[in-house]
Amino acid sequence: MAITRASFAICILLSLATIATADYYAPSSPPVYTSPVNKPTLPPPVYTPPVHKPTLPPPVYTPPVHKPTLSPPVYTKPTLPPPAYTPPVYNKPTLPAPVYTPPVYKPTLSPPVYTKPTLLPPVFKPTLSPPVYTKPTLSPTVYKPTLSPPVNNKPSLSPPVYKPTLSPPVYTKPTLPPPVYKKSPSYSPPPPFAPKPTYTPPTKPYVPEIIKAVGGIILCKNGYETYPIQGAKAKIVCSERGSYEKSKNEVVIYSDPTDFKGYFHVVLTHIKNLSNCRVKLYTSPVETCKNPTNVNKGLTGVPFSMYSDKNLKLFNVGPFYFTAGSKAAPATPRY
């Protein structure tokens, strides 16, 4: 508390001293403002960059030295024994001869019969009767006078005395009632002219093209043995007959090699008329069985015209035979 009172007393004394020493200006002279001059009391700092002295020496890199512990490999050529080739031994297959039964195709649907519809020409009956115009029956007008005939009496007239007592007449337009028009009898125009309908035959439904193919079996007849030939081929020869029985535009199609059962299959897509086509034997890969025979027309060719059903998708021919000798195999094969 003593310190606070002493400091308060010192502040009061200093304020009184400043009031006593203050100059009082006369109200006539305005004060002159002088800007203060600020002089730095401290010198400007001088920047000295720090000097870093490394305390450790720079590292020295010594690359490692790798010493192989293994000796380099020595390559020597392998001494392999020469391969011994043993040719395969082909034995005749011990399969029984297949018995081929040609399938019988029975059409399940009868061919459609197109009949032309009998259309009767339309008869247009008017729904309204034509108007009948009748002349109006008008009775002649008879005018009957309503006045009796005048009686001529001799008037006793005095001489007229003219007195202008009447005003001049005023003419007014008569007001006539509006005319009444009678409606004419109602007349409906006839129906517009309609041309006769043209008959358009019904369009036939779209029938997709039937893909036809040829299939058969090629066998080898060697004595009394008969077995199928794998890799044999047949050919289809198609020609168009010209004048004097001369063929022209002959097309030959070769089948794919037969399978292990001796079966071949050929798809005929680009030939429309199959009646001039024949199926014949072509080649056999078996050296001991390469002579074609005419059994089931294997040489002359099986014509497609012998098939009466034109809706067949697969034509089965054969079986055809190759033989080892020059003699042909029997006409009826025996298994």
UniProtKB/Swiss-Prot annotation:
Under which name does UniProt file this protein? Proline-rich protein 1
Functionally, this protein is described as follows:
May contribute to cell wall structure in root hairs.
**Family membership noted in the UniProt record:** Belongs to the plant proline-rich protein superfamily. ENOD12 family.
Q: Which GO terms describe its cellular component?
A: extracellular region
Location relative to the cell? Secreted, Cell wall
Q: Which UniProt keywords apply?
A: Cell wall, Repeat, Secreted, Signal
Signal sequence extent: 1-22
Q: Where are the sequence repeats?
A: 30-34, 35-39, 40-43, 44-48, 49-53, 54-57, 58-62, 63-67, 68-71, 72-76, 77-81, 82-86, 87-91, 92-96, 97-101, 102-106, 107-110, 111-115, 116-120, 121-125, 126-130, 131-135, 136-139, 140-144, 145-148, 149-153, 154-158, 159-163, 164-167, 168-172, 173-177, 178-182, 184-189, 190-194, 195-200, 201-207, 208-212, 284-288, 319-323
Where is it made, tissue-wise? Exclusively expressed in roots, especially in root hairs.
PANTHER family referenced in this protein's UniProt entry, alphabetically = OS01G0164075 PROTEIN, PROLINE-RICH PROTEIN 1-RELATED
Q: Does the keyword Kinase apply?
A: no
Q: Encoded by which gene?
A: PRP1
Coiled coil, from the record: none
Extract the ranges annotated as region (39 X 5 AA approximate repeats).
30-323
